[in-house]
Amino acid sequence: MASLASSQTEPNTSESPVPASMFSPEPDGEDSDCSLDGEPLRNGEADIDVTSKFVLVSPSAEQYDSLLHQLRDRMDEGRGETIYVIGQGSDGTEYGLNEADMEASVATVTSMAEQIVADMILLREHQEAGGKVQDYLVRKSVGDNDFLEVRVAVVGNVDAGKSTLLGVLTHGELDNGRGFARQKLFRHKHEIESGRTSSVGNDILGFDNHGQVVNKPDNHGGSLEWTKICEKSSKIITFIDLAGHEKYLKTTVFGMTGHLPDFCMLMVGSNAGIVGMTKEHLGLALALNVPVFVVVTKIDMCPANILQETLKLLQRLLKSPGCRKIPVLVQNKDDVIVTASNFSSERMCPIFQISNVTGENLDLLKMFLNLLSPRSSSREEEPAEFQIDDTYSVPGVGTVVSGTTLRGLIKLNDLLLLGPDPLGNFTSIAVKSIHRKRMPVKEVRGGQTASFALKKIKRSTIRKGMVMVSPRLNPQASWEFEAEILVLHHPTTISPRYQAMVHCGSIRQTATILTMSRDCLRTGDKAIVHFRFIKTPEYLHIDQRLVFREGRTKAVGTITKLLQSTNNLPMNSKPPQQVKMQSTKKSLHGKKDEQSPAAAVTEEASPSAAAIGVTAGAGAMQAQPKTGGGGRRRGGQRHKVKAQGACTASTGGC
């Protein structure tokens, strides 16, 4: 954005927050990134003048078609919605229209919205030098069982008020200051007792086509019926409530990588300030390229000087070289509209100050959430791909998987490939039913979360990290891959054979470093690293983001190359750890036609050993007591040794 770029160095030199008005377009300058009605057209239509603020009053047929084409493009860019400003042009004239011109312009925009089947919501009306200026939210109308979905991850240090804020937003009741609101969200008994979230929670906030909240809790139990909310809503905000405590960091990282949030809401307690895991969670969101906005809570109980100190530290953190954000303090509806329309640039960081007890500024936060547009883009003609982040076994239904549709279109009774299994194979399965937010639907598109009931498959064969893909993709699982990683923190040095947990989408598995482009890695180093999974192969993509962590060690990176596919390996080829584990578990004294995995590997590696037959089997039986650890460690092993000695003597193996 032109105005943002021109002022980039200005706000970074001061400690005061940046006013939101600086991001508004200048009356005498052109700003192609702002949502003006006079935006110059591309695609060879620049000869039709639509830069004047009066073009909407009585447009010609050519101008009307150009404006309609422009609105369609902006709706596509905004994933189904955009902010349209009436009374502003980019031809240098002063802003504002008189009453009659404004009425005619609104009628023109309403006509265009009807053509593209969209609703208009008046956001604000303000007076300028030339008259009135009105801002409208144009949102695409959806069907009865469809809605726009925006996922917001809620992170922050423990006791910052994450669950309390979500309880107030979703249930519409203010908190009593003693944990009343958060009790409605907890899923486990120990969470209710301790007041701390330990699992990934999901809560929804619905907005209708007029921008009003539709959440109405049940009068008796106080619970929310998701089906009724989805039926009334044109837009759903899905909150991913993550744990703030350090010991649940693994769960928080999985929520950020596996649930694919569009935005991240960082919670900061005004009385405690930036402490504990606040910087960790902010760094994680920045590493995954998720836009962040900040909510400062508990302003009703915090002294003014402490609140100002917290805001000053927060602005200093956001402007630091690691973040390079532009903090904007949101204080009124004008600030909300300006920040929401420019938030997708990922440079601006709005800061809200709220109280869950008094309800102060909660209306500004709800308005901002209503204006957020989903960031994920996907075309329906692409091959379908769905990542699994949880599994269930529902009585009377069978196996159910939940997760996120990454791309494409999935319909009822579609045949998909589920995998990879421990051998890297994919199994054909059929979709029995589809639910979105507990509401039955017939199809899901890219960027939407859903649950599928699958036919004729056991829950035990499915794990987190598996995918369901279209057969057109011809999927292949990989044991090894290369990634370019940046070490954010490590106490000493990282060298080959180092093992740590890799988070990549919904995948969460330990991987070993085989080789690196540098001898060793320290904090701040960047290198190309060759990884190998230790347990099962996974389905990966080039340019997929990953988080590499173990204890206090943290690194982020991007996959650059997939090195090895299981389709190119023998069926019995597994990592050495698995082969060794199986060879010690299974006894060699079974039926004569049975063969141990260790013997199978030996036979695969050496054809001569397979030709010898009995002698090779006797040699394997002789070696077994040694690998088992001696006769005294395993019950009854000494008798087996005697039996083996008699067997080898009779066959001449000795």
From Swiss-Prot:
For the region G1, what residue ranges are annotated? 156-163
Amino acid composition bias (Low complexity), ranges on this chain: 609-620
UniProt domain tr-type G: residue ranges: 147-377
In residue numbers, the region (G5) covers 355-357
Q: Where is this region: G2?
A: 195-199
State the UniProt keywords alphabetically.
Cytoplasm, GTP-binding, Nucleotide-binding
Location in the cell: Cytoplasm
Instruction: Spell out the protein name for this chain.
Output: GTP-binding protein 1
Q: Give the domain of life.
A: Eukaryota
**The organism of origin for this protein:** Xenopus laevis
